[in-house]
Amino acid sequence: LKKVERKYEEVIETYGDMYEAEICKERQLPDYNDGMRIVQRRLFWVFLSMSREKRIHLQKSASIIGDTLKLHSHGDATAYGSLVAEVNAVASLLKGKGNWGSKTSSVACRAAAMRYTECAMRPSAEDYFRYAQHSDMVTGEIGYPEPAFIPVPFPYALMNGFFGITKSGKCQIPSYNIHDLYERLLFLLGQKPEKIIKPYFGMTLKMDGEFQNLLTQGIGKVE
């Protein structure tokens, strides 16, 4: 092997940037295909791998997390934290039973331990994931098969929004009304006239025309 001498700063910068780019792509930011972070996709896939009769009935959260860890080996706290976030999402596809915490009270209330809570898929999730069986499967990091992405009508992040900070910037995706997203989808399929949809959370708009340019051309300014 040839010895290569490099400055410590160069090594940190080069490999640090490579690591950050990989983390952003694989874990921190939603995938553009289905709008899900990898832990979200793995959680939903655990439900979708069950029979319909089982997934629409309440399951112990500890059991769900146990199955998720077969795909997502980054600790039960991370997986359960994501499950709590999905149950409490604005347009949640999961329903919960037990203490799932509260963000509305003046005092922060954390969710109960996973052994005390239960959750199941909402009926609306059956429609959203209707094409899940057509997912392209890949071998996950532990060796189990998992979907590269799940075919969905529109990216999940557009329903519930997303905010994340990375080493070199931040990602902020506003939330849209589900009905408006389906209206936009029908327009893109040529089934309905164009309707400019507006986010209802996560963004402040200066002018309607400015947002129309942002939506149709990708050019505009938001706060």
Language model features with spans:
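Catalytic phosphate-handling regions of large nucleic-acid enzymes and associated NTPases
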Residues: L1-T216
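Charged, surface-exposed alpha-helical interface/stalk elements
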Residues: G218-E223
